[in-house]
Amino acid sequence: MPDHLFEVSWEVCNKVGGIHTVIATKALTVTKRMGDNYIVVGPDLMQESQNPEFEADDTLMTAWRESLYEEGIRVRIGRWNVEGRPIAILIDFKSLISQKDDVLKRLWEDYHVDSISGQWDYVEPVLFGHAAGMVIKSYAENFCSSADKVVAHFHEWMTASGGLYLRKNATGVATVFTTHATVAGRCIAGNGLALYSDLHKFNADDLARRYNVTAKHSIEKMAAMYHDAFLTVSDITANECKYLLGREVTHITPNGFENDFVWQGEEYTTKRAAARKAMIEVAEACYGTKFEKEPLIVGTSGRYEYHNKGEDLFM
């Protein structure tokens, strides 16, 4: 087990999809084993408003936080409001926007990451990941001894630049990259192609160009190649990685949840009834009518990938 573990995701204190659930629901177990040597790192996207998932604590690592600020990196440090309450570092990566060309240039020179076609939905996560790598490097230099085992775990292409940064600048930090679904695989499935039966026939680089995701696919592919360990969550995605990213995964780590992830008994019944009532009220407001009998509710959540969720028509 490592002495220090960082877990980096765009979904730390920022619920987008299932990765938020994966990390949040294991935090209790990890903090029981590692205490405050387990730190989660996410983007600071709600600076002007209250983030209900984050509780700032100005007493945590005050001097170090101020030293980061002097280096041009703004962070907030506190606790993630989930079971286990791990230390959370939220990074304001906007200070790196003026350096974006240099960051992207270095990714090309060091790893041949092709960022030319990347738009802001690519650039912002890359800057966040890069800043996360800088923060982890600084932490290791200030709080860890040369004998400590330090591991930084990066989820999805949105954070991959962090691991690539550490590989060049902090060789004492072991890097782990997990993909929960490949960029090319999402495109193949979302466009009605036979992902699993024809997987061995696809050229992922060509597909990325066709669907205009070259930059995202490129950094994901290089992350798979150059992190110390490459993980995914199932046999199916492991096969995707083999054919679309060109590297077999080091390990498969199935998603796991705490036993109390779903409410039990009366608490479950009460919360379900309240949620159903709220959904019906919203639907009635949208339609401008009252439903005469109990309606059937079909809902989707997480990423806006309707076809991948089995919906051929969305209105």
Model-derived features: positions:
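Catalytic cores of nucleotide-sugar-dependent glycosyltransferases that transfer UDP/GDP/TDP-activated
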Residues: M1-M315
